[in-house]
Amino acid sequence: LLVHDRPIRRHADDSIVRIVAGREQVLRRARGYAPLPIAIRRAAPPLLAVGGHLKNTVALARGGEVFLSQHIGDLETPEARRAQEAAADDLARLLAVEPRRVACDLHPDYASTRFAHGRGLPVAEVQHHAAHAWACLAENDLEPPALAVCWDGAGWGPDGTVWGGEFLAVDAEDCRRMGTLRTFPLPGGEAAMREGRRAALGLLWEMLGPRLFDQSALAPVRNLTASERINFAAMLRRGLNSPRTSSAGRLFDAAAALLEVCSVSRFEGQAAMELEFAARRAGPPPPAYPFRCVRSGGAAAELDWRPTFAALLAEHAAAQSPAIPAARFHATLAAMIVAMAQREGRERVLLTGGCFQNRLLLELAIAGLRRAGFRPYWHQRVPPGDGGLALGQAVAVARQANGEEGDGCASASRVKS
């Protein structure tokens, strides 16, 4: 055998594509797709967009096109960060374009944000969920107005809190937060991304307060050690390392833990995936659980999931299998989307963010919106998750920059509350 470990000059993973609602949907855009351009409605100045921290891609905008790089991955390691820099430089050389500004996420601690600020160019910070919305709008070749349903695990909100269950009214130049999921605390912060039981405890605290630790029939409580009970009670009571979040992704994790489907994930998205698999065993979609939609003054409407989880827990206590409660949970989230679309009254509804990698949720939402007379749009050529952020960042800045030079785009596409 003649072998040689040749260095990889330009890495490119295999692309991942599936069929959703009869159409192709790209989940990982790499070999065979990148760096093919996405056409955009407004010409962009020479611009580099550096994406987010997870599932990173970068993009180079030139005129009426945005060239999206191959999937780079999570920027947790020095090797990944060097790959991001190489991908950005490769695009500039390939297209013979010298970027004159950089777009990045609003999160101050992302490696991609630090990379953007280190380029020595004017920087435009684009709010995470606004970038999701603009990406979905652009790849579907649409113009505002639209309602964007932006559901994912986490994104830095302009108010400094952790967003993730957002409804944005997308207009010609900006986005407005017109609805959100009710927030709840996440004991342990980022640890809750791996341990759905933490999300479940935070959710139960929001529903029951200190009484949650008396609910030994519930798996997330029953399986706590004595020291864990003390520590979690102190964290939640005093708000220590327990940031509040509106994340739809963490609702999936909490539901999976409460239904005893998955309490601790071995890989990203495991809890939500197992919950979807359990729901598919239920057969035809059952009816949704109750929920409330509350609006106070001029603030964004709030979808209150507490009636949903009260009903889910009651049904789970009497059920032989998690299948029906899991299916009804999915149906409820789809019903929430339709309810908010009806409140806002915008015909076009964009379904974007990592939660819409869940095919059951996506197809239920599409069907429900169509029955209610709306026109749903979702990602097909660009991933619905953070792999599409760079496209959205480029589009947001292109819409606000209007081809002007200088650093006046420093606050591009902040979301208005």
Feature names for model-found ranges:
Residues 1-42, 244-245:
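Internal gly/pro-rich beta-alpha loop/helix module
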Residues 35-47, 125-148:
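Conserved phosphate-binding catalytic cores of ATP/NTP-utilizing and phosphoryl-transfer enzymes
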Residues 47-49, 103, 146-150, 245, ...:
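Short glycine-aspartate micro-motif
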Residues 52-90, 205-347, 360-367:
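A contiguous, well-structured pocket-lining segment that forms one wall/lid of small-molecule binding clefts
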Residues 96-108, 345-357:
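Short glycine-rich phosphate-binding loop at a beta-alpha junction
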Residues 120-132, 348-349, 359, 365-389:
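Conserved phosphate-binding/catalytic loops in two-lobed NTP-binding clefts
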Residues 140-205, 237, 242-246, 252-258, ...:
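Active-site histidine-anchored catalytic micro-motif
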Residues 161, 212-220, 394-417:
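Acidic, glycine/GT-rich loop-and beta-edge segments that sit at the periphery of enzyme/chaperone cores
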